[in-house]
Amino acid sequence: MPIRVPDELPAVSCLRNENVFVMTSSRASIQDIRPLKVLLLNLMPKKIETENQFLRLLSNSPLQIDIQLLRIDSRVPKNTPVEHLDTFYCDFAQIKEQNFDGLIVTGAPLGLVEFEDVAYWEEIKEIITWAKEHVTSTLFICWAAQAGLNILYDLPKYTLKQKISGVYRHTTCDPFALLTRGFDETFFAPHSRYAGFPVEFIQQNTDLEILATSEQAGAYLFASKDKRVVFATGHPEYDPNTLADEYHRDVKAGLAPQLPENYFPDNNPNKKPLVSWRSHGHLLFANWLNYYVYQITPFDLAQMNPTLD
């Protein structure tokens, strides 16, 4: 899927070097096609790295996608140039009157922070509530999944004593589920979180359909029956070295982190990790875009009332 982004976005050259089809705004403007409008609320500290990861996964299908990057934290960033944010990101006030086909809310390193202590918690609540009327389907990733469950289903924060970190085997729950169509019966995905998502906890407190689980990591994929909200509790977007970078960062900070499970060859942190989750990540995003966004979103976004046949 050609992703439509500003001509000067750093991800353009990065992804083109990987042979990923990126369509700049200038080229897309000459095509008479209604692109899917996807809003990416980027909560990760390293904005540019996260942009690359998600744009890579959004690029692998034949439809055109118009990506809008959204920020809500007005504090001076430590890991991303202010000029980059000012050039490529919008504030919520600039888009709140618009409708979108899809919204992706990324993870955030806030696993041990209470919701009410998050600096932009009120803004998160406003956007997730806004999305119910303005977005066809919303995809929550990792910490955002926990935040979404709290805001939409009033579920309390479920924090584990020990961080889940590593690459875990998962099993699909329904061979005919659209979100996992084409998945192998077992597949791998990275996790890096303190949040717990026990299967029974989700089943007993929501009407969400659980679509994939892990014995070690709990519920991984679950979604509403009307396809309006989707939760992925891991990080299918992670690069090969993201977990390694997090581990070595925490070692340098003196936090004595546990070694990510099922990740480093021979459990040796000096060896290069092998990727076992890339194909599943691409397929997950392709299925979400096709079955949860494209097939139910209205052609005219002014008529926002997506329903299922």
Swiss-Prot record:
Its EC number is 2.3.1.46. Keywords: Acyltransferase, Amino-acid biosynthesis, Cytoplasm, Methionine biosynthesis, Transferase. Substrate binds at K163, S192, R249. The active site is at C142, H235, E237. It is an enzyme of class 2 (transferase). GO terms for cellular component: cytoplasm. It comes from the Bacteria. The record marks S192 as: Important for substrate specificity. The record marks G111 as: Important for acyl-CoA specificity. It is found in: Cytoplasm. Pathway: Amino-acid biosynthesis; L-methionine biosynthesis via de novo pathway; O-succinyl-L-homoserine from L-homoserine: step 1/1. CDD domains: GATase1_HTS. GO terms for biological process: L-methionine biosynthetic process from homoserine via O-succinyl-L-homoserine and cystathionine. It catalyses: L-homoserine + succinyl-CoA = O-succinyl-L-homoserine + CoA. Its main location: cytoplasm. One of its GO terms (molecular function) is homoserine O-succinyltransferase activity. It holds the Pfam family HTS. Gene3D superfamilies: 3.40.50.880. Transfers a succinyl group from succinyl-CoA to L-homoserine, forming succinyl-L-homoserine. Belongs to the MetA family. This is Homoserine O-succinyltransferase. It comes from Proteus mirabilis (strain HI4320). The lineage of its organism: Bacteria, Pseudomonadati, Pseudomonadota, Gammaproteobacteria, Enterobacterales.
